[in-house]
Amino acid sequence: GLASLLGKALKAGLKIGTHFLGGAPQQ
């Protein structure tokens, strides 16, 4: 349903966010 889709998107977003925060150099 919509809730599980939202949960998946949120988890994916968090994964991408932490990847960018941890992997990309801050300028």
UniProtKB/Swiss-Prot annotation:
The keyword Secreted applies. Expressed by the skin glands. GO terms for cellular component: extracellular region. One of its GO terms (biological process) is defense response. Its main location: secreted. It is found in: Secreted. Keywords: Amphibian defense peptide, Antimicrobial, Secreted. Antimicrobial peptide. Belongs to the gastrin/cholecystokinin family. This is Caerulein precursor fragment R3. It comes from Xenopus ruwenzoriensis (Uganda clawed frog).
